[in-house]
Amino acid sequence: MELLNQKKIASLTEEIGADNVPVLLEIFLSELESYLKVLCDATYSDKLVYLKDISHALKSSAASFGADALCHFAVEIDTRAKEGDALDETQDVVAMIDRLHQTQQAYLSWQANGF
């Protein structure tokens, strides 16, 4: 699974216009940063609640921005949570933090190279 799906990014660029991509990308990157902060700063008992909320929110935004690996993981966590499957505070939260960070870094690199 691709970290960033270039075809989806190109499609988004075509739909909204190349001038709008940097603005929306900044908003998305800001969201990723806030999710990272929430998960890293949350108390032990709150981490799973935030993980569920963040996963639900990321399903559509990550898909829209072509963040396929992040979207796939968010869908997996959201589905497991809705089905009542136990989420692991350590493993699942750490995996989400890792995917958020990887996606953020990939977009920052892509942005630095002029989109």
Swiss-Prot record:
Domain (HPt) ranges: 17-107
InterPro entries given in the database record: HPT_dom_sf, QS_phosphorelay_intermediate, Sig_transdc_His_kin_Hpt_dom
GO molecular function: protein kinase activity
One of the GO biological process terms: phosphorelay signal transduction system
Gene3D superfamilies membership: HPT domain (1.20.120.160)
Phosphohistidine: modified positions: 56
Lineage: superkingdom: Bacteria
One Pfam family here: Hpt
UniProt keyword list: Phosphoprotein, Two-component regulatory system
SUPFAM superfamilies named among the record's database cross-references: Histidine-containing phosphotransfer domain, HPT domain
Role, per record: Phosphorelay protein which receives a sensory signal from a sensor kinase and transmit it to LuxO. At low cell density, a phosphoryl group is transferred from the sensor kinase, probably on His-56 and this phosphoryl group is further transferred to LuxO.
Assembly and interaction partners: Monomer.
Protein name per its UniProtKB record: Phosphorelay protein LuxU
Source organism of the structure: Vibrio vulnificus (strain YJ016)
Gene label: luxU
